[in-house]
């Protein structure tokens, strides 16, 4: 369901054939650059060329699907370069708090039930885990799908191609998927959208775009309950450092970083205590 405070449209300025297909897929209106200039503020989804080319000539794989909020620059997902790849190389590997929270086994199978922009899922895959990303927003899922496709193109580093092969994307409501499909996995990871207290200049434009599209997760407790009945080893919930744990069953342990806390729900211990 569209929750953005701005109307969302597909921009056909670049790659019009792909834009038309995407508009049909997402059931969103198609708009030209001229029409967009004359309209009220819009949230546009379309292709963007960031100046980096795969060769001597620009071709279709040089374009990234991006979200264009009215007040910020383009927001896209890139597993090949930029922050996600930097985090893979210099983020601390298995010693980083996120990795310590989820690595219940050497290479656990993980469901990231709140995939968002895919940053944490990419970290899991870079550590050798098979990861299923579940994203309920069709628009964010389209951005993820485009990023996965670009990361497997000829010319992309082999190690990155191997990482993204371990990522699978499902566009669905996570609670419904876990309840109806009962997938087998070791770990389920949740990163609920926390209600924004106030807007600041420091708020990342990716986070602003997510907040516009999906708003806060008001069903986090329901999702946690579903996850606890599916995960084989543990459920991990990412929270702001000083935020309370999600209501319901309390976590067995927590791992903290400067601004974040990872609450760990160990399935075996919870069952032994009669809490599951």
Curated annotation (Swiss-Prot):
Reaction equation(s) it catalyzes: guanosine(1516) in 16S rRNA + S-adenosyl-L-methionine = N(2)-methylguanosine(1516) in 16S rRNA + S-adenosyl-L-homocysteine + H(+)
InterPro entries on file: 16SrRNA_methylTrfase_J (IPR007536), SAM-dependent_MTases_sf (IPR029063)
Keywords: Cytoplasm, Methyltransferase, rRNA processing, S-adenosyl-L-methionine, Transferase
The keyword Transferase appears for this protein: yes
Predominant subcellular localization, coarse grouping: cytoplasm
Family classification: Belongs to the methyltransferase superfamily. RsmJ family.
UniProt-recorded name of the protein: Ribosomal RNA small subunit methyltransferase J
Species of provenance: Hydrogenovibrio crunogenus (strain DSM 25203 / XCL-2) (Thiomicrospira crunogena)
């Amino acid at each position: 369901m569209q929750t953005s405070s701005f109307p969302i449209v597909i921009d056909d300025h670049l790659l019009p054939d792909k834009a038309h297909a995407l508009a049909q897929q997402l059931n969103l209106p198609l708009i030209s650059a001229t029409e967009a200039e004359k309209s009220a503020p819009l949230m546009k989804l379309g292709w963007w060329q960031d100046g980096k080319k795969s060769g001597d000539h620009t071709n279709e794989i040089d374009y990234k699907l991006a979200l264009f909020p009215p007040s910020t620059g383009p927001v896209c997902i890139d597993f090949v370069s930029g922050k996600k790849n930097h985090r893979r190389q210099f983020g601390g590997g298995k010693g980083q708090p996120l990795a310590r929270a989820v690595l219940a086994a050497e290479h656990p199978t993980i469901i990231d039930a709140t995939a968002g922009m895919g940053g944490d899922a990419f970290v899991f895959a870079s550590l050798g885990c098979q990861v299923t990303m579940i994203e309920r927003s069709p628009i964010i899922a389209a951005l993820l799908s485009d990023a996965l496709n670009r990361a497997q193109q000829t010319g992309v580093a082999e190690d990155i191609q191997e990482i993204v092969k371990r990522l699978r994307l499902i566009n669905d409501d996570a609670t419904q998927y876990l309840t109806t499909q009962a997938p087998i996995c070791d770990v389920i990871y949740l990163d609920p959208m926390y209600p924004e207290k106030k807007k600041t200049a420091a708020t990342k434009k990716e986070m602003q775009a997510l907040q516009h599209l999906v708003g806060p997760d008001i069903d986090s407790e329901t999702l946690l309950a579903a996850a606890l009945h599916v995960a084989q080893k543990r459920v991990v919930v990412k929270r702001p450092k000083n935020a309370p744990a999600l209501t319901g069953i309390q976590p067995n342990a927590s791992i903290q970083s400067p601004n974040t806390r990872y609450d760990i729900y160990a399935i075996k211990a919870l069952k032994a205590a009669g809490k599951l």
